[in-house]
Amino acid sequence: MNSTRRVAVAALSATALALTAACGSGGTGGNGGDLTIGLAVSTLNNPYFVELKQGAEEAAAELGVKLTVVDAQNDATNQVNQVQTFTTQGVKAIIINPVDSKQAAPAAKAAENANIPLVAVDRSIDEGKVASEVASDNVQGGSLAAIELGRATTGEVVHLQGIPGASASRDRGQGFEQGLNSGGIKVVASQPADFDRAKGLDVMTNLLQANSAIKGVFADNDEMALGAIKALGDRAGKEVMVVGFDGTPDGLKAVEDGTMVATVAQQPKVLGRKAVEQAVKAARGETVQQVVDVEVKVVTKQNLAEFKK
């Protein structure tokens, strides 16, 4: 567990409310009965979070609970409103994948006021009561990315950051800075591209104008890395080494093609699955695991076969 992952443990119990399922996926069988869980995802425009949702849906089906999924489309205010709506719909637990860790505080407060247990997945919440936090060790992942980039090249590199307020972006950046000590690379520019491929392309294009001699790029996720690769053109994987984060299918394909030297693979389906498992336990008043760490691994051409689906 790294120091930036803060979990405020509360003995939260779900209020007995009539269930209304607005939309989403549900399962039958198991021991879930009429229990409904709400899942608030930051964005389903990112393949990584689509996989997280799929893992959550699979777990819900196996446990026999209903899962209602909403997409904030990377709008923190919208996400707070969605969670507040959940509290009026009779859900027995809420899972949140925060758009912004700080701006998620009102969502956490809404869940607390409604006496509904809250589980954070993939990203933490800076302030608020959380029954369980399910996430990768992003500090470790960022450090591994720096080490791998340092093995692949030397000289000046740039860092494409995610959403500034997201804990995953902060933690990966912290780990990347720590890992720089082990290699011969130096960060000459860092700029947010909000975990978005199109923004990654635009930001990378602009950065290249002032830093044309760079030798490497670390992007906080594969989507931004793929945008950077497009901006680099034929230089990607030859003159400029790119390291991503997530291990998405498109990211793995870039590793296979040689345009991305490595990606730090997460397990989004496992994250989604474990988040639902903890949410169901919390809804039933059972003991939950306060922090659930999901392993990350560096993927290169050498071990790519282990991760291809």
Residue spans for each PLM region:
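A residue-level marker of the well-folded mature domains of exported/periplasmic proteins
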Residues: N2-S13, L17, C23-K309
